[in-house]
C-alpha cells in the first residue's frame, strides 16, 4: 500500500470493524519491490499466497489446490487455458500462435516462504513479470495448477462490469 494511504486504510479498518491482526507493507516502485517489502515483514517457514487485489473472484478450490501443491512441491501458480485466438506481432508482421501451448497465469501465486524470500533477495530484473518469474530465475521449476476462469483481472471498466455480473449471479443462487 502506498505510504500516503496507510491512514485511510486504518480508517477503513475501524469503520468496517476489520480486526484480524495484520501488517501493511509499504508499496514499492514496482510490483517486485512491493512484494519484497511485504516478504521482509513475514517470518516463519509456512506457505505464503501472493495475490493481486484486482482479482477478487478467486475460488476456494483454487486456493486449496495452490496450498496443497505448494506444501508438496514448494510453489503453485494457477493457470487457465487460453480460449481465444492469439497472434504474435513483431516488426509490422504477425502470425498465429498455437494456443494449446499457452495458458493464462493468475494469482494467488503460492510458495513455501523461505523459497520465495530467497528468490526475492536477487536484484530486480525488468523481465520479471510476476512472482513465479522471480522464483524461476533461481532455477526452480514452476508448478502450474488449475485456476478458475472467473478469477479475472480487473483492468478495464468492462472487467469490473463482468465481475459485478458474476457476483450478482452467484448471490442469486
PLM regions: where:
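Glycine-rich beta-alpha junction loops
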Residues: 1, 81-84, 149, 158
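Conserved N-terminal catalytic core of the sugar/cofactor nucleotidyltransferase
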Residues: 1-45
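Short glycine-rich anion-binding loops that position phosphate/pyrophosphate groups of nucleotides
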Residues: 4-5, 30, 53-56, 83
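Hydrophobic packing residues within well-ordered alpha-helices of enzyme cores
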Residues: 9-13, 66, 116, 163
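Residue-level signal for inorganic ion chemistry
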Residues: 38, 51-52, 81, 112, ...
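Short aromatic/hydrophobic "clamp" motif used to bind/position activated sugar donors
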Residues: 47-49
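Conserved core of the sugar-phosphate nucleotidyltransferase
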Residues: 57-145, 173
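Hydrophobic helical membrane-anchoring modules
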Residues: 151-173
Amino acid at each position: 500500500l502506498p505510504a500516503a494511504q496507510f491512514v485511510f486504510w486504518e480508517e477503513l479498518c475501524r469503520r468496517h470493524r476489520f480486526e484480524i491482526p495484520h501488517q501493511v507493507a509499504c508499496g514499492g516502485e514496482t510490483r517486485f519491490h512491493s512484494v519484497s517489502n511485504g516478504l521482509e515483514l513475514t517470518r516463519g517457514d509456512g506457505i505464503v499466497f501472493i495475490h493481486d487485489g484486482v482479482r477478487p473472484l478467486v475460488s476456494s478450490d483454487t486456493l486449496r489446490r495452490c496450498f496443497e501443491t505448494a506444501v508438496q512441491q514448494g510453489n503453485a501458480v494457477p493457470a487457465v487455458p487460453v480460449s481465444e485466438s492469439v497472434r504474435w506481432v513483431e516488426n509490422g508482421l504477425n502470425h498465429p500462435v498455437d494456443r494449446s501451448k499457452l495458458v493464462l497465469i493468475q494469482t494467488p501465486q503460492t510458495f513455501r516462504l523461505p523459497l520465495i524470500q530467497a528468490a526475492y533477495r536477487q536484484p530486480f530484473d525488468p523481465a520479471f513479470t510476476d512472482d513465479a518469474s522471480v522464483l524461476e530465475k533461481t532455477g526452480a521449476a514452476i508448478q502450474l495448477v488449475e485456476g478458475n476462469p472467473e478469477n479475472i483481472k480487473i483492468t478495464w471498466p468492462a472487467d469490473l462490469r463482468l465481475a459485478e455480473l458474476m457476483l450478482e449471479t452467484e448471490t442469486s443462487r
